[in-house]
Amino acid sequence: TLDRSSAASDVYKRQVKDYVDIVEIGTPIVINEGLPAVQHLNDNIDGVKVLADLKIMDAADYEVSQAVKFGADVVTILGVAEDASIKAAVEEAHKNGKELLVDMIAVQDLETRAKELDEMGADYIAVHTGYDLQAQGVSPLDSLKTVKSVIKNSKVAVAGGIKPDTIEEVAAENPDLVIVGGGIANADDPVEAAKQCKAAVEGK
């Protein structure tokens, strides 16, 4: 995840990309620089998908359409959004051949909501331990297990405080997508960190 424009360096564009499948434009960049940041990344990196972490809450079809217009392959919406918003986002993403990731941050009843989102056609359901809970030592592992146990069609993503030295425990639960932010972006050697994460996910 790129959360600050200073992180969007040639290292990420040309080297880290060799070890990732999706590069995320984090919410802080979207807030500070707007969707042109998504376009910029899309224009300057090849061979990986671009995820725009908009954390949509309302006007979902419009916001998805704008992210897609600027080159996003995957767009995020909050799981606490209204069903009508999520259904509209799914429809807009799929109409354009793109994917929707539903972020479960702040969802209280994970099991029930995951089932509902699965039925609505979400491409990814992401269990997410936010920065504020990470500071309290909360891990996404239990949430990951809960969501995996109840969904039938959606893929499962996991995010929140994952680093090269903790990713093996997460990877052991076989999520479809592991989202690593600061564990790569803030590492002394981001390329080596990305390489370690990829190896852990692939079980090497």
Regions found by a protein language model. Name each.
Residues 1-8, 12:
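Single conserved hydrophobic/aromatic residue that forms the stacking wall/gate
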Residues 23-25, 50-54, 75-77, 100-104, ...:
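Hydrophobic faces of well-ordered beta-strands that scaffold small-molecule active sites
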Residues 31-55, 89-106, 140-160, 197-204:
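Alpha-helix-loop-beta-strand connector modules within alpha/beta enzyme cores
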Residues 40-92:
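Glycine/small-residue-rich loop that forms an oxyanion/phosphate-binding "nest" at active or ligand-binding sites
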Residues 59-69, 109-119, 162-177:
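Catalytic cores of alpha/beta
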Residues 72-83, 125-134, 173-194:
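Glycine-rich phosphate-binding active-site loops on the catalytic face of alpha/beta enzymes
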Residues 113-145, 154, 193:
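Glycine/Thr-rich beta-alpha phosphate-binding loop at enzyme active sites
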Residues 149-159, 163-204:
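Alpha/beta catalytic cores of nucleotide-metabolism and tRNA/nucleoside-modifying enzymes
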